[in-house]
């Protein structure tokens, strides 16, 4: 009986330590941008951070504001315009925002532009830069897609991609993301890396820009 109590106490302590560690990682991301989950070449790291910095310049932009209109203008003026469709102020605009960031950085050769998330996922697949392995550890500058209607199903998320953001950084089990059209603004999201509604990642080939 004595040993069972000791084991129970040790288990509780381990759980508490794990919880506190996760809380620490979460707070770290709230106060900063996080880290690269693995080492990448310096030139690639610089390019990834340039994309993230460009996205962060729009942080706080409210829907239907002047800045929102400017984001859509960047997207709509790009040629070729995906689907030949100009995004309106009343449209969902997360993919248009993520595309506009790439356009502003002259990275459309490695980031396919689209105003629809599921179509953009298809474009990543077409160029062989789509990743949906749950073990993948994202890097700053990766594009993260969600299927919010997947209803927390266990196993591989295969639902319809209906939202997208750009990875800012990681810490422990969490990812920090910047997103357009999050609660009708450009804002951060901190999400568990193994969240069941993460559809997958579009991976810009930053390395090819340094060859």
Show the residue positions of the predicted features.
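Aromatic- and glycine-rich peptidoglycan recognition patches
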Residues: 3-9, 13, 19-40, 45, ...
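...with weaker cross-activation on analogous glycine-rich loops/strands in unrelated enzymes
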Residues: 22, 49, 108-184
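N-terminal capping segments
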Residues: 27-105
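Positively charged, low-complexity intrinsically disordered regions
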Residues: 69-71, 120, 190
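Solvent-exposed, flexible loop/coil residues
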Residues: 75-79, 127-129, 134, 186, ...
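Surface-exposed loop/turn and secondary-structure junction residues enriched for glycine/proline
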Residues: 84, 92, 96, 100, ...
